[in-house]
Structures are given as C-alpha cells and as structure tokens.
Amino acid sequence: MEKFCEAASVLKSIGIRVTQARILMLEALHSGCGLFTAQALHGKLPGGTADLATVYRFLALLVREKLAREITGTDGVLYYEMACSHNPSHPHFECRKCGRIYCLPAFQPEERMRFPACPHGHGVESVSVVYRGTCSACRATAEKEDKE
C-alpha cells in the first residue's frame, strides 16, 4: 500500500491549527479502506479524543477544503473518504438490500465517461458516480434461499 499523506502537513497546507485530535482523525481516515460515517470515524478514535460534533465539523472542513469527498447513501447517511493523490475520484456501489456502500476501481482514462455539457453559467463542483443494485453476497444469499 502506498504511503499516505502526512497528517500534520495536510493540516498545515490548508492553514488550520494542528491538534492531536485532528491528526488522529486524519490518520484514522487514512488507515481504513473505503468509506466512513462520522460515527464510524468517532468509534475508531481513542476515548476522549473528540466528541461526535467535533468529528462532524472536522469532516465538513475537509470536504470544504476538497481533502475529503462526501457520498450520500439512499438512506440519507453521509459517508466520507479522503480525496488525495492516493485516493483519486472513483465510482461506488451501493447494495439496495444490505445497504453496504463500497469503492470500485477508478476509471482508466480510456474508460472515462462523457457527461453532457453543463448549462452556460453553471459551475460544477463535483460529479459522483454510484452504481446501485444488489451486491454479490446478497445475490448469493437470495439464490440459496430460492433453492430451499
């Protein structure tokens, strides 16, 4: 696995104060694979590091500074992932049966989708590609139940 961005340098690059809690939150985000909810990130922190409201504020700051991406599940839950050179933009898959959302490989340049032009005067801030359907585990379970 590639070496991730150094937490203190990331914080300094956006001009915010480096604190132990922010370093621990960034390291927790970098250590995991895939998407996190604010609650899951809070659960990965040592007790007393930061309250849940602080985690939400920090994630909002990372999104605002374009260091994290926010993905909204069909259930309305917000998921976050780092948006750095080690984690380029990529599509996701959301299972409608179990609710799991996970990362798919990034499109290769020759596979990139062509989107229609944005209306004149509009400014695009982000594009999100989420495949929705039934994951392989849920499909296998359904097929097994159908055979019984």
List the predicted regions and their residue ranges.
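Short, Lys/Arg-enriched N-terminal segment that forms or immediately precedes the first helix
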Residues: 2-15
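Non-DNA-binding regulatory cores of transcription-related proteins
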Residues: 65-148
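Short acidic, hydrophobic short linear motifs in intrinsically disordered regions
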Residues: 35-43
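Basic amphipathic alpha-helical segments that dock to polyanions
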Residues: 55-65
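Short helix-coil junctions and helix-kink-helix linkers
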Residues: 43-50
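Short helix-capping/hinge SLiMs at alpha-helix to coil transitions
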Residues: 16, 30-33
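Pre-recognition alpha-helix immediately N-terminal to the DNA-recognition helix
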Residues: 23-28
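Short helix-coil-helix linker/hinge
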Residues: 18-21
